[in-house]
From Swiss-Prot:
GO cellular component, one term: cytosol
Name of this protein: UPF0301 protein BDI_1431
Family: Belongs to the UPF0301 (AlgH) family.
InterPro entries: AlgH-like
């Protein structure tokens, strides 16, 4: 009889993580924060890594924390990761001309910046749906930790980012990201979350 490991053998690529990469959780990862998650790396150096889970929306909204936004359409908050879970972060495509002091992640994404400038932008009536994404907490790895997890096959790395990163949510986005890895990975989307329950 085929062993469990052979039945659910996972193929991984050899793509190395860099700033702006996305990490796609392998299908059996059981961690509450990272199960079927897609993580955007906003920093990756020899000293450690930082990123945000893109597809885990919470029941919280930004409007509840800032009375100025009480009458605005609801602005969702996502679960960025287990580190600093009470701190609010944001990524955006507005650029550092609109949001000073924003850190450039790649050609079209930025991290944080002057929050007062962002508030003014919203209060002036500019829509932010699909342009700004808020998180509570972030995902962090110490020196060498992420590379170890990748070698252990917890993550597949991709430099392909979709144009809906700022509005992505749910397991459907994980499946879409897996399919962008190529045909070798399509079986990932067919696996049960827990193979022992299949």
């Amino acid at each position: 009889m085929a062993s469990y490991k052979n039945i659910f053998k996972i193929t991984h690529n050899d793509v190395l993580p860099i700033q702006g990469s996305i990490l796609i959780a392998e299908p059996f990862l059981q961690d509450a924060y990272f199960q079927r998650s897609v993580v955007l790396l906003i920093e990756h150096t020899e000293h450690g890594s930082m990123g945000f889970v893109l597809n885990k929306k919470t029941d919280l909204i930004v409007n509840s924390f800032f009375k100025e936004f009480a009458e605005f359409p609801e602005i969702p908050i996502y679960l960025g990761g287990p580190v600093s879970p009470n701190r609010l972060f944001f990524i955006h495509s507005l650029g550092d001309n609109i949001i000073p002091d924003a850190l450039k992640i790649n050609d079209y994404l930025y991290f944080d910046g002057d929050f007062n400038a962002l508030k003014r932008y919203i209060l002036n009536g500019h829509p932010i749906d699909g342009k700004v994404k808020f998180f509570l907490g972030y995902s962090g790895w110490t020196e060498g930790q992420l590379n170890h997890e990748i070698k252990r096959n917890s993550w597949a790395v991709s430099h392909i980012t979709t144009d809906n990163i700022l509005s992505a949510d749910g397991e459907g986005y994980w499946k879409d990201s897996v399919e962008l890895l190529g045909n070798d990975y399509k079986t990932w989307t067919k696996y049960p979350k827990d193979p022992y329950l299949n």
